[in-house]
Each structure stands twice: as C-alpha cells, then as structure tokens.
Amino acid sequence: MSYRMSRSRVFGALGAAGLLALPACSSGTHPPAAVTTSAPAASAGTTSPAAPVTSVRIGRFTQEFATPLPADQAQAKIIEGWREAQILWSKSLIAWRLVPGVTGYVTGVARTHLLGAISYGKQNDAVPAGADRMFMTSVTSVAPTAATITTCDDGSRFAEVNPKTGTVNQAFATPADHQYLYETWHMVPVGGHWAIGSFTLATLPAAAARHCQP
C-alpha cells in the first residue's frame, strides 16, 4: 500500500473515520522513478517463484508490483492506472507536496488522505524508505464508471526516515500484525484512464488479511 505516512498513524486516522482504509526523500524535489523488472527470490506470499517483479525506485523508497498485468486489456488498463497512482502518491510523500500528475490519478476521499499523509510527514520530518511489495493483485469488478482492485501488501521492509539524515525513525516502526495487509482499491475513470477514488484495508485478526500473511 503505498499510501504512506506512519502505518500506525494511518490506521488510527482511518479507524477514527470508520474506514480502516488506505493507499502510496528530499524536500521540494523528486527524482525520476527508476523502473526495473526482475525475477524475485522465493518469499512468502509470492504467486509464483518465476513471476516477474516490477520495481519502481523513488528516492530511498522502492515500490514493487509482484503480480504481472492481466492478459485482459481492459483489466490491464485498470491495474496500470492503479500502479501510476501508487507511484505518484509515493513521490508526493517524498516531495511533501502534490507532484505534477497526481491529482489526475488520486481523487476524492483518497486525495484527502494523501494530503493528510503529506502534512503528517512534513510535520514529523518523515519520508518513505525501504521497500513495499504488492502481490496477489487482481481486478475483482469492472463497470463503466467504477472498478475494484484487491491486493495483498507486504510492508515488512518499509521504513520512514528523516530526509536530511537518512536516520530511520523507530517511533514509526510498523507493528508485526500490520506488516501484511489486505487492501481494496476503488477505481474511477478520469480523463481517459483509471484513478484511485477511495480504499479500505484489513489487518490481522480480520479474516480477509489472513491469506496475505507469510
């Protein structure tokens, strides 16, 4: 889930809103994302040992998409919009501002949460670092004006650091029962592509989160 601020902070804020819902290292600038594809080492939760992983490097943070795009072109376009939204979300957290293009891919309630995450990160000198892996990702419903994506999210290597020093802030460490999440992303068409409109998440002990655990 690349919705980032401190995960525990996200859970608290979204829980208070009745959602338990989500997402997506230097102030003012953001380097271009480096996209690579490689075969992952065998690890818990991967759909197949040979499944390629698309990795997007953004500053100190790496977003991994472990599930290949679906063969169905309509579904692939939905996933592509979701991936772009995740990347722009993370870039915005690193830049502490909405970066160009993000408002076209993150809208509605999701954008409200992104703005809150940006504000929180700036106030606490924290930006995403480490890595986050989305796996078992699929389009579960499609309609002309809405689509739904579900995914598992491995945040076991995710951290938050001070962008000036690179020091990991242990106060924002992710609790063990929040490292592997089950997420539902509600997508809407915007300007010829798909964008994130809202999202929800499940953590242990919720049944939905159990199949995402290592």
Give each language-model segment a name.
Residues 53-130:
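Core segments of small alpha/beta cavity-forming domains
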Residues 32-55:
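Extracellular mucin-like PTS domains
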Residues 2-15:
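Bacterial N-terminal signal peptides that target proteins for export
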Residues 97-211:
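Structured, amphipathic secondary-structure segments that form assembly/contact surfaces
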Residues 57, 61, 205-214:
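Short, low-complexity, Pro/Ser/Thr/Gly-rich segments in the mature regions of secreted, periplasmic
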Residues 26-29:
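Bacterial signal peptide processing site
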Residues 21-24:
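C-terminal motif of bacterial Sec signal peptides marking the signal peptidase cleavage site
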